[in-house]
């Protein structure tokens, strides 16, 4: 039996990609004439309709949510094969295949359908919420990523204890462990907000519509994924006023700024953990009576604690802590604080390591403050079927 089904072809699946909750979706399977191969169809570019015929076999759609039982839906025979139209009213991640006689039409190479005796691999279908929208300004735009320390420097770099200034702009940053086996990443080349602002005209010439900035919050390292203070910009980058000026000037060029939100972990050298006592606060490492103690999980206090992938300079945050949720997601929290500067949204670091409940609350907070803000989650694997680890 020779059939054709490709979920990326609108002739086979009326809506490619994800489907909005309640929208009508049509599947078509084409029954090709005997001895006519899919390869010939593509090489000859033969009109598909002329190479199909009405099948004798019956076909059934097997469809169900991830981890749940599949439901069966009979397909209707047509002059070209089989068809079915349906609406899915519940959001979620679904998987499906087709049953034709004693064979399963499942996902083959290149995501084409293939007939076999095995039920898997199944095709995937994401059904998203009816009211979900992508802001118009973000559609079809060009997103330009900037690593702030190395993009552009204007003016002198401030002298800050514990940070090594670099004056060889094109040099290789220090990345090897020190004598204690620590990778400090504490050499800085001095890229800053004013430097980015000086390049806005250039970025506009590239048709850039949004800039994604790697972390800008105060931190001990040059990559700044070890947040020290969520409410302050890193002093090497400039001041809050410098950042506000950058946001305002970027908008004049039709460019919006997207900030990197690192909410799965903080730095050990931070207001909140304060492992080295460099901040005036009482950090979680210093006392169980710290207002931040509930933010972290200790196995043996204070030196054994959960950290991001076992890297002890990045103590992992307990997102279930009501205190932490209020600090990040609350009315006077971090998210709304930076949205008030006019940013275009957030890119979430290791989004798949944030609990679903936290992500939902985060989205509500951001969209309540600015419905036009975007939220982008970092996922290293296939993001289309990603479910949070915790």
Model-derived features with residue positions:
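Catalytic metal-binding/acid-base residues of hydrolase active sites
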Residues: 262-264, 349-351, 380
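Substrate-binding/active-site clefts of carbohydrate-active enzymes
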Residues: 147-209, 216-341, 362-369, 385-386
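Conserved, well-ordered alpha-helix/loop/beta-strand core segments that scaffold catalytic motifs
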Residues: 338, 344-347, 351-353
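Glycan-association/targeting regions that enable binding to alpha-glucans and other polysaccharides
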Residues: 1-141
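Non-catalytic scaffold segments within catalytic domains of secreted glycoside hydrolases
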Residues: 380-390
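Acidic-and-aromatic substrate-binding clefts and catalytic sites of carbohydrate-active enzymes
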Residues: 235-237, 351-357, 382-384
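Short, surface-exposed acidic/glycine-rich loop or hinge patches that mediate macromolecular interfaces
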Residues: 216, 322, 352-353, 380
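Hydrophobic faces of well-ordered beta-strands that scaffold small-molecule active sites
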Residues: 142-144, 211-213, 257-259, 346, ...
């Amino acid at each position: 039996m020779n059939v054709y089904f490709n979920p990326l072809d609108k002739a086979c699946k009326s809506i490619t990609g994800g489907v909005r909750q309640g929208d009508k979706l049509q599947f078509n399977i084409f029954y090709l004439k005997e001895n006519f191969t899919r390869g010939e169809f593509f090489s000859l570019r033969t009109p598909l309709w002329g190479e199909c015929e009405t099948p004798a076999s019956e076909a059934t759609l097997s469809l169900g949510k991830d981890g749940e039982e599949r439901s069966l839906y009979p397909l209707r025979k047509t002059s070209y094969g089989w068809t079915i139209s349906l609406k899915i009213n519940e959001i979620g991640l679904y998987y499906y295949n087709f049953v034709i006689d004693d064979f399963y039409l499942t996902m083959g190479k290149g995501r084409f359908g293939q007939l076999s005796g095995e039920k898997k691999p199944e095709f995937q279908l994401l059904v998203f919420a009816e009211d979900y929208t992508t802001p118009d300004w973000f559609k079809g735009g060009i997103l330009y990523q900037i690593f702030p320390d190395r993009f552009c420097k204007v003016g002198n770099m401030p002298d800050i204890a514990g940070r090594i200034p670099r004056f060889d702009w094109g040099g290789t940053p220090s990345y090897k462990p020190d004598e204690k086996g620590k990778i400090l990443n504490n050499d800085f080349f001095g890229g800053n907000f004013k430097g980015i602002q000086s390049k806005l005209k250039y970025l506009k010439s590239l048709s850039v519509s949004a800039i994604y900035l790697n972390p800008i919050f105060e931190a001990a390292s040059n990559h700044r994924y070890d947040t020290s203070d969520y409410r302050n910009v890193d002093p090497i980058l400039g001041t809050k006023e410098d950042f506000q000026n950058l946001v305002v000037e970027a908008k004049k060029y039709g460019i919006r700024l997207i900030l990197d939100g690192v909410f799965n972990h903080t730095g050990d050298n931070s207001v909140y953990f304060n492992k080295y006592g460099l901040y005036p606060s009482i950090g979680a490492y210093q006392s169980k009576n710290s207002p931040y103690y509930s933010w972290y999980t200790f196995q043996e206090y204070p030196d054994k604690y959960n950290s991001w992938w076992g890297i002890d300079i990045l103590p992992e945050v307990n997102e279930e802590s009501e205190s932490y949720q209020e600090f990040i997601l609350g009315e006077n929290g971090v998210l709304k604080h930076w949205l008030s500067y006019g940013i275009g949204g957030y890119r979430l670091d290791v989004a798949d390591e944030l609990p679903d409940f936290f992500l939902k609350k985060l989205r509500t907070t951001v969209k309540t403050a600015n419905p036009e803000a975007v939220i982008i989650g970092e996922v290293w694997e296939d993001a289309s079927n990603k479910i949070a680890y915790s």
